[in-house]
Amino acid sequence: MSLQYSPKNNPRVIVIQKLYGRYFNKEENLTFPKHRFKKFIKDVVNGTIERDEIIKDEISNHLNLDLELKKLDKVFQVIVKSAIFEFLYKPKISTKIIINEYLKASNFFINSNSSI
């Protein structure tokens, strides 16, 4: 018997949802659900928001000249920004784990969109 992947178990899904919501409503106070990784979720969400300009500059430095971050889908922007935050500011987390977890979270959002 294999374990089913549940987005509720992936703190990155919550991170993406919080940052995406924040994109559309900057005035709303952020609240965080009870979760065993609540501290991690808060840290990534708040850190990504606080370091938004640094993260955007870092991303822009690595994009092709014909590609701009602001032209990309908003969910994709949030996923990339939060992953870059973890790469830069969470050195204890393996790069492999960060990539794997954000790929899983991305699949959740892609599959959710395709069923709409």
Question: Where are each of the predicted segments found?
Answer:
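N-terminal interaction/assembly modules
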Residues: 1-116
